[in-house]
Amino acid sequence: MTNIRKTHPLFKIINHSFIDLPAPSNISSWWNFGSLLGICLMIQIITGLFLAMHYTSDTMTAFSSVTHICRDVNYGWLIRYLHANGASMFFICLFLHVGRGMYYGSYTFMETWNIGVILLFAVMATAFMGYVLPWGQMSFWGATVITNLLSAIPYIGTTLVEWIWGGFSVDKATLTRFFAFHFILPFIITALVIVHLLFLHETGSNNPTGLNSDSDKIPFHPYYTIKDILGVILMIMFLMTLVLFFPDLLGDPDNYTPANPLNTPPHIKPEWYFLFAYAILRSIPNKLGGVLALILSIMVLMLLPFLHTSKLRSLMFRPITQTLYWILVANLLVLTWIGGQPVEHPFIIIGQLASISYFSIILIFMPIAGIIEDSLLKFD
């Protein structure tokens, strides 16, 4: 008799996705981050659901409700810090996952890649709105500054901002709608993840060499299920260390002060995972130009399939582009550092140079390096 997992309509889908899925035999630990992101999403949805049971989205009580969760709810402090630091883990895994895709040429799976970029935007939007909910100083002013950027859109900008605010400033209406969107978006993200996997399983996984691996496939279970479990254990150990020993390490002390529209914090800055984009935004003196650069800093990922000039897919055998890739990584770390610094000399010029080099490496130097490497390898 055929196994039920191969015949049952529901189990069959799970079987083809996680059990009998043919996977390349040589995928490294860099391929673990997809499953880790799935675990992160589950952690965020579960902890978020329990937080939503006790949270009130009203300007008068939002801050106190978060305090109440931490003080009075059973293990409320754990749920709250798991959710806050879980977001950081989510972004660490996201950046590594995208970086892996860039290094090994996974962007040639265009549907999978583009849905991945849309997912990145959706997760960033969700995280931004989640940061507003505790209604601390940085929540309020972060929301004010970032939503205000839309006023740079010609003609409709101011109207659009007031429409998003639901009034003439960030207030109760804004907080309520941000809570509503923050609640619904993770479920939209889950649906997008399923589509992301659907397109991935149409082509099969890439591998470190970038070569076709159809002739050398192994079943996902038990090989990669065990490998993924190891990754999950390591990630949870790291997350729990963060939550139980350094819960406020990545947060801003200003957010422990209730929101006050009459008092602006000295340095308004987002969470660490947005700092690179914030640095790019600030490096352009023009408001509309800054907003466009901010959007393009992520949108540029969608151009990667068209900027690929080499006949080799992966960077495994391409030392020149490899060097450029690691310069790009260092450059992003510099941008992250600059995003957290005040707008003064020498940080302004460093930020501008780092922003120019970010776009130059991706749009100019990497495609040229691909052509040079092809000529050196005498492919013609």
From Swiss-Prot:
Residue runs in coiled coils: none
One term under GO cellular component: respiratory chain complex III
The UniProt record lists the keyword Heme: yes
The name this protein goes by in its record: Cytochrome b
Membrane-traversing stretches: 33-53, 77-98, 113-133, 178-198, 226-246, 288-308, 320-340, 347-367
Residues involved in a ubiquinone binding: 201
Additional facts recorded: Heme 1 (or BL or b562) is low-potential and absorbs at about 562 nm, and heme 2 (or BH or b566) is high-potential and absorbs at about 566 nm.
Annotated organism of origin: Hylomyscus alleni
InterPro entries: Cyt_b/b6_C, Cyt_b/b6_C_sf, Cyt_b/b6_N, Cytb/b6-like_sf, Cytochrome_b, Cytochrome_b_C_euk/bac, Cytochrome_b_N_euk/bac, Di-haem_cyt_TM
